Amino acid sequence: MIKGIKGGVCAARGFKANGLNAGIKNNTKKDMALVYSEKPCAAAGTFTTNRVKAAPVKWDYKLVHESDYVQAVVVNSGVANAATGEEGMKCCMEMSENMGKALGIPAEAVLVASTGVIGRQLPMDIINAGIAKLPENMAADEEHAALAAQAIMTTDTHSKQVAVRIDIDGVPVTIGGMCKGSGMIHPNMCTMLCFITTDCAIDKNLLQKALSAGIDETFNMISVDGDTSTNDTVLVLANGMAGNKPITEEDENYKKFYDALYYINEELSKLIAGDGEGCTCLFEVRIVNAPVSYTHLRAHETSQD
């Protein structure tokens, strides 16, 4: 049974978060966030299909597929670090290196994400000052999960968080997530960043499979304005601190985890669609007895048009 709980990205054991105003947006709104795990994590990710991919997308794709483990994600809002060329990639490296130093972990264990204005270089002096402050007050509670969720917002009217708990062989396992997205919402996926944390012990390849399998029927099924973003990113970090027997095959326990992760993605997708720029209501269409997935998708596209 999937039980909804509070806590967002801090609901799962061993995860801390923080969000603050570094000054990127030139106002009092929070614009930098950190999600950190006490233990190394298996990581999975899905990314934009736009031909123009922002520097953080390229950076994270490489780390998710090549790093032995991941332990933190640092995010800035206000500037997307998209269409920024080689300088943009250098900024990603600098963010990872400085965040790693501040946390005492390797740069290769730090994922980065950016959202905001396209075509503008990151103000690295401001960002580096924010990076130095983020670990100071990070904590594993609802308040700091909320601060992080607020800090990743751009045109969103409210923050978006979900968390659930399931039972795997008598062991409570938790999954929590936060996301942002309001405009440029169109598969695949939308202008959105999504960060999911779990204390489940699960094989990295199965974690990626569970994420990828659920994305098509959740985030890739929402649309607001038909625009596909340069920065779309969904990341999942699993630190294994629940203490369950590691999930290493597609058995009943994998199915339980998959269903819970799917639920998280589905609920976050609805929050994004409901907060779309110019939207006044959210329609949910249920298609019953569609013979094949193609019919399902065609009906979805028609409903968007």
Question: What positions do the PLM features span?
Answer:
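N-terminal amphipathic/basic leader segments beginning at the initiator methionine
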Residues: 1-47
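Glycine-rich phosphate/pyrophosphate-binding loop regions near the starts of catalytic domains
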Residues: 35-92, 187-207
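Short, well-ordered amphipathic alpha-helical segments that serve as non-catalytic structural scaffolds
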Residues: 53-63, 89-102, 208-221, 260-269
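Short, surface-exposed loop/turn segments at secondary-structure boundaries that line and modulate
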Residues: 73, 78-86, 108-129, 223-246, ...
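Glycine-rich, mobile lid/loop segments that gate access to catalytic sites or pores
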Residues: 102, 107-216
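Flexible, glycine/charged-enriched surface loops at secondary-structure junctions
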Residues: 105-111, 140-149, 162-163, 219-231, ...
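Glycine- and Gly-Pro-enriched alpha-helical subdomains that act as flexible
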Residues: 222-223, 241-249, 253-273
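Conserved small/polar residues in nucleotide/adenosyl-binding loops
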Residues: 295-302
